Amino acid sequence: MMKPEFSHFFGFCVYFLFLQVMASSEKLRVTTPTRHLLARVGGQAELSCQVIPPHSVMHMEVRWFRSGHSQPVYLYRGGHKMSEEAAPEYANRTEFVKEAIGEGKVSLRIYNINILDDGPYQCSFNDSGFIDVAIMNLNVTAVGLETEIHVQAPDADGVMVECNTGGWFPRPQMEWRDSKGATLPHSLKSYSQDEARFFHMKMTLLLTNMSHGSIICCISNPVTGEEKQTSIILANELFNQDYLWVGIFPFSVLSLILFGVLPFINSFFRSQGCASGCLSKCLPVVTSWPVQIVHFLVCSGVLFAVYLPHRYRVSLSDPQFPLYNNWITELLIVILFLTICFVLPITVLLLIKLSPTCLAKWEKNKDDIMDSQLGLGKAREASTLYEEQSRKSWEQEK
């Protein structure tokens, strides 16, 4: 039986069609081994892409770019880096890793990561008749370096504790905990971002007693789960309001005594007739209670307007924290000092101004008294002599 002459040709055609089908089933595509990458601020990140199935991309155009950016992060074309077309913010910070370029694997290494590098990236391969893109996301993280707890001066409501931290990205989670790990409700929480996009957080807590034991400020990064804790233990004396009266009562008594000095001085000088002319008009006004109180309040207001803002919040790391914490005693000392500084200068000025007049008055009064005493003595002698003469006359008549 004779074979057909076209059998070899037919087999070749079938084989060719089979290869075409296989080639179409193995169409090239771009993928990335990791779609989500983590990188710390100041560290480095490696964005990898590869062609599947393995295929040399040495003569392809490889581009990394970001949505919304007109310039690519990195551009590889014709076997060379196209630096002039890359975005300037990535200049001298990128490296093209091409050890496995013959297998279709390439990477872009970014150094000195900053917060602006956070976000999605796209990697594209372009060749005649082939183009494909893979997307990956770079998550940049930063953990704050310092956490401070500030304590406001206690008042009738309790003690306000404030936790401050900065240098975080993305925005961290904050909460107060007690010594048993239970979450405490915060009074206020706020945040801000600086020019470098770092987050700065502030959280406050109002404490009315020390039943919670130690107080812990917890801050955690929502991406990495890293957590930082700072704790404090406040003295029980801060929550004991009885000590207020220990300072307020003696201060009130002493203030009344000091404020009463000038009116008594005024009354004394007037009784002696020392004040005359302008002084007789000014002295009652200057030494009156309303003028003293207004002067004292004005001086106190000016002092506290300058003083209190500088000690409103005190860090536990401040070496003067024990001094600032005893604010009641400190406040009373300042007010007492103001009172003394108000009373003494006026008293001294009055004494200096009125002493010459009073001395003259006192000398005159002294002379009058002596004269009156001398006249009284003569009158007594005359009376005694008269009595003796009367007695002698009566005896003679008898």
From Swiss-Prot:
<dbReference type="InterPro" id="IPR003599">
    <property type="entry name" value="Ig_sub"/>
</dbReference>
<dbReference type="Pfam" id="PF07686">
    <property type="entry name" value="V-set"/>
</dbReference>
<dbReference type="Pfam" id="PF22705">
    <property type="entry name" value="C2-set_3"/>
</dbReference>
<feature type="domain" description="Ig-like V-type">
    <location>
        <begin position="26"/>
        <end position="141"/>
    </location>
</feature>
<dbReference type="InterPro" id="IPR013783">
    <property type="entry name" value="Ig-like_fold"/>
</dbReference>
<dbReference type="InterPro" id="IPR036179">
    <property type="entry name" value="Ig-like_dom_sf"/>
</dbReference>
<feature type="topological domain" description="Cytoplasmic">
    <location>
        <begin position="266"/>
        <end position="288"/>
    </location>
</feature>
<feature type="topological domain" description="Extracellular">
    <location>
        <begin position="310"/>
        <end position="331"/>
    </location>
</feature>
<feature type="disulfide bond">
    <location>
        <begin position="49"/>
        <end position="123"/>
    </location>
</feature>
<feature type="transmembrane region" description="Helical">
    <location>
        <begin position="289"/>
        <end position="309"/>
    </location>
</feature>
<keyword id="KW-0677">Repeat</keyword>
<feature type="glycosylation site" description="N-linked (GlcNAc...) asparagine">
    <location>
        <position position="139"/>
    </location>
</feature>
<feature type="topological domain" description="Cytoplasmic">
    <location>
        <begin position="353"/>
        <end position="398"/>
    </location>
</feature>
<keyword id="KW-1133">Transmembrane helix</keyword>
<dbReference type="GO" id="GO:0016020">
    <property type="term" value="C:membrane"/>
</dbReference>
<comment type="function">
    <text>May act by engaging a cell surface molecule on immature T-cells in the embryonic thymus.</text>
</comment>
<keyword id="KW-0732">Signal</keyword>
<protein>
    <recommendedName>
        <fullName>Selection and upkeep of intraepithelial T-cells protein 8</fullName>
    </recommendedName>
</protein>
<keyword id="KW-0812">Transmembrane</keyword>
<feature type="domain" description="Ig-like C1-type">
    <location>
        <begin position="142"/>
        <end position="233"/>
    </location>
</feature>
<feature type="transmembrane region" description="Helical">
    <location>
        <begin position="332"/>
        <end position="352"/>
    </location>
</feature>
<feature type="glycosylation site" description="N-linked (GlcNAc...) asparagine">
    <location>
        <position position="92"/>
    </location>
</feature>
<feature type="topological domain" description="Extracellular">
    <location>
        <begin position="26"/>
        <end position="244"/>
    </location>
</feature>
<dbReference type="InterPro" id="IPR053896">
    <property type="entry name" value="BTN3A2-like_Ig-C"/>
</dbReference>
<dbReference type="InterPro" id="IPR050504">
    <property type="entry name" value="IgSF_BTN/MOG"/>
</dbReference>
<feature type="transmembrane region" description="Helical">
    <location>
        <begin position="245"/>
        <end position="265"/>
    </location>
</feature>
<feature type="signal peptide">
    <location>
        <begin position="1"/>
        <end position="25"/>
    </location>
</feature>
<keyword id="KW-0472">Membrane</keyword>
<keyword id="KW-1015">Disulfide bond</keyword>
<keyword id="KW-0393">Immunoglobulin domain</keyword>
<dbReference type="InterPro" id="IPR007110">
    <property type="entry name" value="Ig-like_dom"/>
</dbReference>
<comment type="similarity">
    <text>Belongs to the SKINT family.</text>
</comment>
<dbReference type="InterPro" id="IPR013106">
    <property type="entry name" value="Ig_V-set"/>
</dbReference>
<feature type="disulfide bond">
    <location>
        <begin position="163"/>
        <end position="217"/>
    </location>
</feature>
<keyword id="KW-0325">Glycoprotein</keyword>
